């Protein structure tokens, strides 16, 4: 099963919820040519792990493990039987700490794979309700939409009929820590009402129109704090690249 990456075309922070989590307005688009892959494979006879992930990256305490534990509260017997014979193979192609949602997409694909394999018969809303307990971007990947306006803490998804130009990507070898970038944003000067007003304009425009008519700092509230925390990102800010999420992946329209 393919777990596709995503890009944020705009990302505006508009307040906090009751848990002090950031509220956002954003355009998410699915990147169909960049994906991780998940599959069930026969378990090695000497493996003693109840749930084993075989991967080309470090998997301890990752979001798929958390999804397994959450599902096991309701489907413990089914999961134990499956993973007594199978392991989960995860092939990572999406850069990590890059603003592309790789972990969230992997988690969504794991939930979908379990729903299909174990015939759990969970509908989309039930899957989204589970995903909210795990992470903020997962709902978009569950939706299957190619483009959507996303709000709340990432759980409110509205499909958008979009015009998406070809994008040229650059993946700096910089691991941007999401929490650190958000914390740096909080230390700055911001106007949530202004951000929300801008977002209401942006969400009506196509991705092509957004990238043609607005500056990178206007579209993504996290670009300035990202460049402050990670000085090597400043050159991309100055050279009119657009930032996805909290970084470090950047892109331009491929003309």
Curated annotation (Swiss-Prot):
Give the top-level enzyme category. Answer: transferase
SUPFAM superfamilies in UniProt:
GHMP Kinase, C-terminal domain, Ribosomal protein S5 domain 2-like
Q: Which Pfam families match?
A: GHMP_kinases_N
- Signal peptide location: none
List GO BP terms, alphabetically: isopentenyl diphosphate biosynthetic process, methylerythritol 4-phosphate pathway; terpenoid biosynthetic process
Q: What positions belong to coiled-coil segments?
A: none
UniProt keyword Membrane present: no
Q: In which pathway does it act?
A: Isoprenoid biosynthesis; isopentenyl diphosphate biosynthesis via DXP pathway; isopentenyl diphosphate from 1-deoxy-D-xylulose 5-phosphate: step 3/6
Q: Where are the transmembrane segments?
A: none
Q: Which residues form the active site?
A: 6, 137
Catalytic reaction equation(s): 4-CDP-2-C-methyl-D-erythritol + ATP = 4-CDP-2-C-methyl-D-erythritol 2-phosphate + ADP + H(+)
Enumerate the residues binding ATP: 95-105
Q: Which family does it belong to?
A: Belongs to the GHMP kinase family. IspE subfamily.
Record's function text: Catalyzes the phosphorylation of the position 2 hydroxy group of 4-diphosphocytidyl-2C-methyl-D-erythritol.
Q: PANTHER family from the entry?
A: 4-DIPHOSPHOCYTIDYL-2-C-METHYL-D-ERYTHRITOL KINASE, CHLOROPLASTIC
This protein's name: 4-diphosphocytidyl-2-C-methyl-D-erythritol kinase
**To which species is this protein native?**
Campylobacter jejuni subsp. jejuni serotype O:6 (strain 81116 / NCTC 11828)
User: Lineage of the native species?
Assistant: Bacteria, Pseudomonadati, Campylobacterota, Epsilonproteobacteria, Campylobacterales
């Amino acid at each position: 099963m393919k777990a596709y990456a995503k890009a944020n075309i705009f990302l505006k922070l508009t307040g906090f919820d009751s848990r002090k989590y950031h509220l956002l307005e954003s355009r998410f688009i699915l990147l169909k040519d960049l994906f991780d892959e998940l599959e069930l494979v026969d378990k090695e006879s000497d493996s003693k792990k109840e749930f084993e992930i075989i991967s080309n990256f470090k998997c301890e305490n990752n979001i798929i493990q958390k999804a397994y534990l959450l599902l096991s509260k309701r489907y413990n017997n089914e999961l134990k039987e499956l993973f007594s014979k199978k392991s989960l193979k995860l092939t990572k192609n999406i850069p990590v700490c890059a603003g592309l949602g790789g972990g969230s997409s992997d988690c969504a694909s794991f939930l979908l794979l379990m729903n299909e394999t174990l015939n759990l018969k969970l509908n989309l809303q039930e899957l989204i309700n589970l995903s909210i307990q795990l992470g903020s971007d997962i709902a978009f990947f569950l939706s299957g939409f190619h483009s959507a306006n996303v709000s709340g803490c990432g759980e409110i998804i509205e499909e958008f009929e979009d015009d998406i130009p070809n994008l040229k990507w650059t993946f700096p070898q910089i691991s941007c820590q999401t929490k650190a970038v958000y914390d740096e944003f909080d230390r700055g000067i911001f106007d949530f009402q202004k951000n929300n007003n801008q977002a209401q304009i942006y969400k009506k425009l196509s991705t092509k129109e957004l990238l043609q008519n607005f500056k990178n700092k206007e579209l993504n509230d996290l670009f300035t704090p990202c460049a402050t925390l990670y000085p090597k990102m400043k050159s991309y800010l100055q050279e009119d690249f657009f930032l996805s999420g909290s970084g470090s992946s950047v892109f331009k329209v491929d003309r």
